[in-house]
């Protein structure tokens, strides 16, 4: 699996249980090499979430926002670049992240991101994550795969 190898090459050690929990998100578009990502969620509770996001060269996560839910303002997230280059776009403004740099995205803020030519690894730290509620600007995008 690409993500497990990339994480280990970056010095991020995984247990066998964690390796088995790596998720692949193609956003329902079946163009994973271009649009998609792989992720490992370490913890996702009512209070916090921590995950690793792995992107291949040039791979993109589509534009979206994290809306309010259950009395919360929505997910606030901090992206910390661990490896490669991340082109983060927040409300249309580019925020390039190199290894060791981070950026916090407020709840409800439109954003998308793309890996540089060597791929990228992002550590995400956030409030509770409810991916199934994400709102994408492209109506054909689905965060949770629907099997018909």
Question: Model-found features: residue ranges?
Answer:
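Short acidic-glycine-tyrosine-enriched beta hairpin
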Residues: 78-80, 90-111
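Double-stranded beta-helix
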Residues: 116-148
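Short beta-strand His + acidic residue motifs that chelate non-heme Fe in jelly-roll/DSBH
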Residues: 62-63, 88-89, 105, 111-116, ...
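A short, polar/proline- and glycine-enriched secondary-structure boundary/capping micro-motif
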Residues: 61-64, 73-75, 124, 133-136
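A short, N-terminal "cap"/entry segment at the start of jelly-roll beta-barrel domains
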Residues: 1-52, 147-148
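Conserved short histidine dyad/triad with adjacent acidic residue
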Residues: 34-38, 52-72
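Short, surface-exposed beta-strand-loop junctions and turns on beta-sheet-rich folds
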Residues: 69-70, 95, 128-130
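Glycine- and acidic-residue-biased ligand/ion/polar-headgroup-sensing regions
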Residues: 48, 56-57, 74-91
């Amino acid at each position: 699996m690409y993500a497990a190898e990339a994480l280990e090459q970056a010095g991020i050690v995984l247990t066998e249980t964690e390796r088995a929990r790596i998720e692949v998100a193609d956003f329902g578009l079946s163009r994973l090499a271009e649009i998609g990502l792989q992720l490992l969620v370490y913890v996702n509770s009512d209070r916090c979430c921590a995950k690793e996001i792995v992107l291949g060269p040039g791979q993109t996560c589509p534009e979206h926002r994290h809306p309010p839910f259950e009395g919360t303002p929505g997910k606030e997230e901090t992206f910390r670049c661990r490896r490669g280059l991340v082109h983060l776009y927040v409300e249309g403004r580019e925020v390039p992240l190199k290894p060791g740099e981070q950026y916090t995205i407020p709840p409800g803020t439109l954003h998308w991101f793309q890996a540089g030519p060597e791929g990228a690894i992002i550590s995400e730290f956030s409030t509770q994550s409810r991916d199934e509620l994400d709102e994408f600007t492209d109506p054909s995008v689905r965060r949770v795969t629907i099997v018909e």
